[in-house]
């Protein structure tokens, strides 16, 4: 199922889309409805490629409100973890997502290298897991930055900057 809702955040429209079946299978967001729908199609294709059964039949859900509450800091990321299905996620990716969500709190960032060191893996492996994160906002991949600057973000640099600034992050260099 798919739930889509528009919220106002800091004078901006934020469209949140959640694919779910029992629990959250994937999340996306965008500044426009059209952009969100394109991202949802891409997310559904990604999930299906990982053998996740996805339906894009629209159905209202409290999951969009849950993601919004995490986005604005009303609910801690970690508290939303039980709502994620982790379907189609590898054991390594799940370990990265859970560690990041539990240890890198709102208003802080971590470098790819520091995250890799904490998990005893390589920065490249961490970067790959961040790129494949189907749960942005709840699993705060936007808080992972490069030593030289903001780094990459699958949904776009403008979106990453927006999220970091919303959380009060002023500097994002390691």
UniProtKB/Swiss-Prot annotation:
Family: Belongs to the MGMT family.
Catalytic activity: a 6-O-methyl-2'-deoxyguanosine in DNA + L-cysteinyl-[protein] = S-methyl-L-cysteinyl-[protein] + a 2'-deoxyguanosine in DNA; a 4-O-methyl-thymidine in DNA + L-cysteinyl-[protein] = a thymidine in DNA + S-methyl-L-cysteinyl-[protein]
Other notes: This enzyme catalyzes only one turnover and therefore is not strictly catalytic. According to one definition, an enzyme is a biocatalyst that acts repeatedly and over many reaction cycles.
Protein name (database record): Methylated-DNA--protein-cysteine methyltransferase
Main enzyme class: transferase
PANTHER family according to UniProt: METHYLATED-DNA--PROTEIN-CYSTEINE METHYLTRANSFERASE (PTHR46460:SF1)
Stored Gene3D superfamilies: Methylated DNA-protein cysteine methyltransferase domain, Winged helix-like DNA-binding domain superfamily/Winged helix DNA-binding domain
Species the sequence originates in: Thermococcus gammatolerans (strain DSM 15229 / JCM 11827 / EJ3)
